[in-house]
């Protein structure tokens, strides 16, 4: 008799932090102001175009998204970064994606009562 694998459930990982369109736009518009100030001479010469502000309404209309779950909200909303700040890990440590997968798998297994 041969053994076979069966998928009996699925898991989901949802980050604890969320960013609303309003929060994202506030941060993005601050970045736009920083960019335009930093590049004001090139913008005045016509070498590059000035960035323009966005709005929460535009994001919702264009994407249908009102809020998104994120890892490291502070890093994403920092107009000097605009990306998550996730420390580099050694090759001996599990990756962020591995941790996410393990949490999702654990949630799935608990639902089907393999783990308690």
Regions found by a protein language model. Name each.
Residues 1-116:
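Conserved "HGTGT" condensation-loop signature of ketosynthase/thiolase-family condensing enzymes
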């Amino acid at each position: 008799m041969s053994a076979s694998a069966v998928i009996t459930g699925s898991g989901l990982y949802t980050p604890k932090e969320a960013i609303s369109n309003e929060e994202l736009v506030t941060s993005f518009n601050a970045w736009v102001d920083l960019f335009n100030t930093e590049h004001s001479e090139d913008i005045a010469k016509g070498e590059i175009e000035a960035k323009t502000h966005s709005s929460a309404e535009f994001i919702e209309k264009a994407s249908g998204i009102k809020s998104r779950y994120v890892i490291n909200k502070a890093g994403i909303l920092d107009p000097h970064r605009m990306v998550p700040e996730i420390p580099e890990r050694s090759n001996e440590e599990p990756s962020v994606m591995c941790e996410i997968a393990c949490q999702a798998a654990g949630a799935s297994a608990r639902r089907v009562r393999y783990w308690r």
